[in-house]
């Protein structure tokens, strides 16, 4: 399961030969994608569309590869972050975890989490990347499985806009009622309410769900940004009800930030470096956060420290002090005296995620490392940014980054139930489903067109204007 840096030595290959192999495999992969994508959505009722000179043209073939990269990058980052999940949450209340991790802890022994009963992670004795090799299978987790369900529901119902009834039906069908069902805080409360007959968005109203400010929606809805490439306005419309299934107020705005980031990945100027793209996308997405919200103030606090070249560890420690110890800017989770001092809260985990996003500067490895070491619910930010960066560099970019091949199989039945083929899918199959969803979104929600001969989308461009959330 561990990344092996000795591949070139073991096989006695020169760097030039290795690069040539990667290049050849990339060409073969692209040819395969071109052959396979022509068969995607062949029964789609395509309306005649006359392209406009102002349309944004996006290749369906390239987007398929990017969606593959999303699922692969998300899995690598998710499982790596799981090693340190809830190892470090601070020293307030009954549960104290000592000093936070620093970059020096990478590669060193993992310490027990708050529920580890004194034992380190059973995933790895050390803090390091976790891989599913070619002949193995990635398992789903709560940072990937609800997104999988939403994609499935959009595809099954042949819609771009899920209803409360469709969300409730999907949750009840694919989530276990008892045993380990991999739901916590707001997700679990919303699920309980659905079992009682309640429909979203009522399942997140503060009067019904006391956990409305927890992390849940920001790990289950980012994918809607990819379903509306370069059009965050459409992405927010599609994601509104899924987000409001579990989140309100700051937790809702934070989730919308992530959705916008994912949509802007297809809008940003690709002539910029990936670092420049990430910084531009983050500043644009932050406009969604109301200026008087603690979410906005958290973003500004981390961004200011980053701009001042303050090391990420110091920024993380200052974030903890400012918001959990001193409860500044209206962040009053600590005074609520909830379990683990709100280690599942949307706010502190958002602040932590902005640290790994900005200081990672678009480098996949660095971003995952920082997210894994930053603390709290560490698998959530890593999964979110691993998915985003995996999308931006694609399958081949991920393989080149780690100089290895990965499994392309995914087992949704590790955490969810009642899917075909006993829950085993390939990333290519999952990406194809995404392409079919986007075909409908481009035509029905954007008023654009799909050209199956050229394998492109024509997306009407509008002025980018990110409004504050309400």
Where would I find each of the regions flagged by the language model?
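Acidic, carboxylate-rich catalytic segments that either coordinate divalent cations
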Residues: 22-25, 29-44, 300-339, 395-470
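Active-site-surrounding "flap" and adjacent substrate/cofactor-binding loops of secreted or lumenal enzymes
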Residues: 83-131, 144-146, 168, 178-181
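Active-site cavity-forming subdomains of large catalytic enzyme subunits
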Residues: 133-134, 138-142, 146, 151-255
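N-terminal leader/propeptide and maturation segments of large enzyme subunits in energy/redox metabolism
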Residues: 124-140, 144, 150-179, 247-256, ...
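Accessory "access/gating" subregions that flank catalytic or transport cores
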Residues: 43-45, 49-58, 190-212, 221-231, ...
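Mature, well-folded catalytic/scaffold domains that follow N-terminal targeting or propeptide regions
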Residues: 64-68, 194-205, 210-218, 227, ...
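Catalytic phosphate/nucleotide-handling subdomain of diverse soluble enzymes
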Residues: 76, 80-82, 86-108, 247-250, ...
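Bacterial Sec-dependent N-terminal signal peptides
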Residues: 1-24
């Amino acid at each position: 399961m561990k990344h092996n840096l000795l591949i070139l030595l073991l096989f006695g290959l020169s760097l030039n030969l290795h690069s040539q192999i990667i290049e050849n495999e990339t060409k073969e992969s692209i040819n395969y994608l071109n052959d396979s994508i022509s068969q995607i959505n062949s029964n789609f009722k395509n309306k005649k569309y006359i392209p406009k000179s102002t349309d944004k043209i996006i290749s369906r073939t390239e987007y398929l590869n990017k969606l593959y990269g999303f699922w692969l990058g998300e899995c690598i980052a998710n499982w790596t972050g799981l090693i340190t999940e809830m190892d470090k949450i601070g020293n307030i209340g009954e549960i104290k975890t000592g000093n936070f991790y620093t970059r020096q802890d990478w590669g060193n022994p993992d310490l027990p989490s708050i529920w580890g009963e004194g034992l380190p992670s059973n995933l790895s004795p050390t803090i390091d990347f976790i891989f599913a090799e070619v002949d193995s299978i990635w398992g789903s987790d709560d940072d990937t499985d609800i997104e999988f369900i939403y994609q499935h529901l959009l595809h099954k119902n042949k819609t771009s806009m899920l209803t409360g009834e469709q969300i409730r039906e999907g949750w009840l069908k694919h989530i276990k009622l008892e045993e380990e069902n991999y739901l916590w805080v707001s997700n679990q409360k919303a699920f309980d309410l659905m079992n009682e007959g309640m429909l979203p968005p009522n399942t997140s109203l503060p009067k019904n769900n006391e956990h409305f400010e927890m992390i849940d929606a920001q790990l289950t809805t980012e994918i809607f940004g990819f379903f509306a490439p370069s059009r965050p306005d459409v992405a927010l419309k599609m994601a509104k009800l899924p987000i409001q299934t579990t989140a309100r107020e700051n937790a809702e705005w934070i989730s919308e930030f992530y959705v916008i980031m994912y949509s802007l990945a297809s809008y940003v100027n690709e002539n910029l470096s990936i670092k420049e793209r990430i910084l531009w996308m983050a500043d644009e997405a932050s406009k969604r956060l109301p200026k008087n919200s603690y979410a906005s103030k958290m973003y500004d606090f981390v961004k200011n420290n980053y701009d001042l070249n303050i090391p990420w560890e110091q920024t993380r420690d200052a974030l903890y002090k400012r918001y959990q110890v001193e409860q500044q800017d209206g962040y009053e989770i600590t005074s609520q005296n909830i379990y683990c001092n709100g280690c599942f809260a949307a706010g502190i985990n958002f602040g932590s995620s902005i640290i790994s996003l900005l200081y990672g500067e678009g480098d996949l490895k660095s971003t995952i490392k920082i997210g894994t070491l930053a603390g709290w619910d560490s698998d959530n930010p890593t999964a979110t940014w691993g998915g985003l960066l995996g999308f931006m560099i694609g399958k081949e970019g991920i393989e080149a980054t780690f100089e290895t091949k990965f499994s392309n199989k995914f087992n949704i039945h590790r955490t969810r139930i009642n899917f075909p083929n006993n829950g085993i899918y390939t990333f290519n199959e999952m990406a194809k489903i995404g392409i079919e969803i986007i075909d409908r979104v481009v035509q029905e929600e954007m008023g654009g067109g799909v050209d199956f001969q050229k394998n492109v989308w024509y997306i009407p461009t509008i002025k980018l204007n990110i409004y504050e959330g309400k």
